[in-house]
A protein has these predicted regions:
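A short beta-strand motif that forms part of the nucleic acid-binding face
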Residues: 141-144, 210, 225
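Short beta-strand His + acidic residue motifs that chelate non-heme Fe in jelly-roll/DSBH
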Residues: 186, 203-212
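Signature of the catalytic double-stranded beta-helix
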Residues: 14-91, 108-117
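Catalytic core of non-heme Fe(II) oxygenases with the double-stranded beta-helix
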Residues: 80-189, 233
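Conserved metal-binding segment of the jelly-roll/cupin
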Residues: 188-204
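Intrinsically disordered, low-complexity, charge-biased terminal/linker regions in eukaryotic proteins
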Residues: 1-18
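A short hydrophobic beta-strand segment most commonly corresponding to one strand
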Residues: 122-126, 213-231
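Alpha-helical transmembrane segments of integral membrane proteins
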Residues: 179, 196-198, 229
Length: 236
């Protein structure tokens, strides 16, 4: 086990951390954590289901057969201040540039349903606590990947991903007129108490902190959802 460069924790069963290595490990953790999350955050899941059902016009369910939406937590523990090294690394673009393909690890579950849409998958982030100078998401919303690129993109080094994103094939597709591939990605600013979501295989990256402060924290509720037989089934 390696120590991360930054103070970072997750709360909940996380597909991209556990399910990719062993789906059994993921479900073992799910069975432990889901009751805890339900006990502590059932009010939050109720709001999430209500608001997203209204927004999407279709039922939205936090599915206990999978890991419930969980948390990304960046920053120091209570009563502790970050040192210069911690703050330096939080200001670096260390997070993976990726598309969300966690659903692939749960194919055996999707097979239980008659109609499953794995092209228009959904991902969301609810900002609960943000650093003093804000936080957000980098997005490359003009990059249109075919299925082969979706399947392979995440498993490259970030430098190689940047090279892929500068490929004229991706941006000379009519989605953006005269886009300059050397420009920075678009930046989506988060607001505490508000949610950002997208549908589809959007290329994105957690944006690094800006002028990080010793007591900064970045806490977000994270989740994904797949449409199964007319219901959005949400998981982490």
């Amino acid at each position: 086990m390696c120590k991360p460069h930054v103070p970072f924790w997750t709360l909940g069963a996380v597909t991209y951390l556990e399910g990719c290595d062993s789906i059994e490990k993921y479900h073992k953790h799910r069975k432990v954590m889901n009751p805890v999350l339900r006990k502590k955050f059932s009010w939050l899941y109720d709001i999430l289901e209500e608001k997203m059902s209204e927004e999407l016009g279709e039922p939205f369910l936090c599915d206990d057969n999978l890991g419930l939406p969980g948390f990304h937590i960046f920053g120091p523990k209570r009563g502790v201040m970050m040192n210069k090294n911690d703050m330096f690394f939080l200001e670096q673009p260390l997070a993976s540039i990726h598309t969300d393909i966690q659903y692939k690890e749960h194919q055996s579950y999707w097979n239980k349903f008659k109609e499953v849409d794995l092209e228009n998958v959904l991902s969301f982030t609810l900002a609960i606590k943000l650093p003093k100078n804000g936080g957000g998401l980098y997005i490359w919303d003009w990059a249109e990947f075919d299925q082969e690129m979706i399947d392979t993109f995440n498993f490259q080094h970030n430098d190689d991903k940047v090279s892929v994103l500068k490929n004229k094939y991706l941006w000379d597709n009519g989605s953006v007129n005269g886009y300059n591939p050397t420009e920075e990605p678009l930046y989506e600013e988060y607001t505490e108490g508000s949610m950002v979501y997208f549908i589809g295989h959007l290329v994105h990256q957690i944006a690094p902190a800006r002028n990080c402060q010793p007591d900064d924290k970045r806490i977000t509720l994270q989740g994904h959802a797949v449409m199964c037989d007319g219901i959005w089934r949400c998981y982490f």
